[in-house]
Amino acid sequence: MSADAGAGAPLPRLCCLEKGPNGYGFHLHGEKGKVGQYIRLVEPGSPAEKSGLLAGDRLVEVNGENVEKETHQQVVNRIRAALNSVRLLVVDPETDERLQKLGVQVREEMLRAQEGPGQAEPPAAAAEERGAGGENEPPAAAPEPREAEQSPQERRELRPRLCAMKKGPNGYGFNLHSDKSKPGQFIRAVDPDSPAEASGLRAQDRIVEVNGVCVEGKPHGEVVSAIKAGGDEAKLLVVDRETDEFFKKCKVIPSQEHLQGPLPEPITNGEIEKENSPEALAETASESPMPPLARTASSDTSEELNSQDSPKKQDSTAPSSTSSSSSDPVLDFSISLAVAKERAHQKRVSKRAPQMDWSKKNELFSNL
C-alpha cells in the first residue's frame, strides 16, 4: 500500500499553524452522513490560510494523533490543548476519495516516506497561489510591514472587487449569511474549485452590489432573490474587511466606479471635532442672529447649566457682561433667566419720568 502511495498516488497535507492574535483562523464542523471533522471556513490572512489549510479539508490527525473517530468536542479540546501551535494532517475531498478507493490509511508517515522536508512544500505553494505568503514563519511576517506602512500604493489596493461567475452543476459554490453584530450580507464559505472561487470570491467578503444593483441595507431574503434573478450568471461587487473599513472611514458606499480611478479620502476625526468644538459653535452663534424662539430656548438652557453656580460667582461675572446686558438682557447668555427678568424690569422702571413734588403740582395747576 505504501508502494502505491509512492507511485504517484495523492497524498495528505501537513499544515503547521502558529496561533495569531485572533486564533488560528479556521472553523471546524461535522457533516451529516459523513464520519469525521471538516474544515468549514478559513479566514483570509489567518495562520490557517498561510499554512495551506483549505475549506472542505477533512481532518485526519492533530499533532500526530488520529482523530477520525473522535467527536467534534474531543477534536476541539485536542486542538486547544496544543496551546500556541498545532500540526494538522488533512486531506482534500478528491485526495480523500482516491485514497479510500486505494484502501490506504492516511497517516503522517506517508509524508515522511515521501522525502519529509520536500513534501512540506506543496501546501506552501498552494498558499502562495492563494496570496497567503510563504511557508511558515518568514513568509507570514511579509504582509505585516505593508499593513503598518499604509503607503499610497497600499491604498490603491483597497478597492472593491467585481466577481463574475456562471452557475455550475452544483450552483455557484458559496454560502451567504448575515451577521447580527454588523449590518450587511457576508460570504460565509467558498467551495473549493467552484465558480465562486474561480471568480475571486473569498470568505468574509461583504456584498455591495448584485448585477449592478446596490444591496446596501437590504435583508437577506432580498439579496438571495436578486442573485437568483440573474439566472445562471451573477456579478457580485464585494469588499473584504479592510476595504470595507476604509470606505466606511471615507463615508462612501463602494461602487463599480471605484474599481479603477481615484479613491475617496478618509474623513479624519480631527476635522469633525474641530467643526463640533465649543469655540466653533460659539463663533457660529455670535455671527448668525438667532430667532426669538431660539433665544428663549438658549436662555432656558443657560439657566439649567448655571443652576449650580453660587450668587458670588454670578456677581463676579456680571461686570464682564454689563455691556451686552445693558443693551438687551435677554441676549446675555451668561446669566440666569431670573436675573435677566429682573434687569429687564429695572430697565423699564429707569425709563419712566421722575415723580413731581405735590407742591409743584399744585402751583402748576393753579397757574392754569
Curated annotation (Swiss-Prot):
Biased composition (Basic and acidic residues): 144-157, 358-368
CDD domains (UniProt xref): PDZ_NHERF-like
GO biological process, one term: actin cytoskeleton organization
Disulfide bonds listed in the record: none
Sample GO molecular function, one term: type 3 metabotropic glutamate receptor binding
SMART domains: PDZ
Main subcellular location: cytoplasm
N-acetylserine PTM sites in chain numbering: S2
Sequence segments annotated as region (Disordered): 113-157, 253-368
Top-level taxon: Eukaryota
Phosphoserine: residues bearing it: S2, S46, S277, S288, S298, S299, S302, S307, S310
A GO cellular component annotation in the UniProt record: microvillus
InterPro entries: EBP50_C (IPR015098), NHER (IPR051067), NHERF-1/NHERF-2 (IPR017300), PDZ (IPR001478), PDZ_sf (IPR036034)
Annotated signal sequence range: none
Subunit relationships: Homodimer, and heterodimer with NHERF2. Binds the N-termini of EZR, RDX and MSN. Binds the C-termini of PDGFRA, PDGFRB, ADRB2, NOS2 and CFTR. Binds ARHGAP17, EPI64, RACK1, OPRK1, GNAQ, CTNNB1 and PLCB3. Binds PDZK1. Interacts with CLCN3. Binds the C-terminus of PAG1. In resting T-cells, part of a PAG1-NHERF1-MSN complex which is disrupted upon TCR activation. Forms a complex with CFTR and SLC4A7. Forms a complex with SLC4A7 and ATP6V1B1. Interacts with TRPC4 (via the PDZ-binding domain). Directly interacts with HTR4.
Known function: Scaffold protein that connects plasma membrane proteins with members of the ezrin/moesin/radixin family and thereby helps to link them to the actin cytoskeleton and to regulate their surface expression. Necessary for recycling of internalized ADRB2. Was first known to play a role in the regulation of the activity and subcellular location of SLC9A3. Necessary for cAMP-mediated phosphorylation and inhibition of SLC9A3. Involved in sperm capacitation. May participate in the regulation of the chloride and bicarbonate homeostasis in spermatozoa. May enhance Wnt signaling.
Identification of the protein by name: Na(+)/H(+) exchange regulatory cofactor NHE-RF1
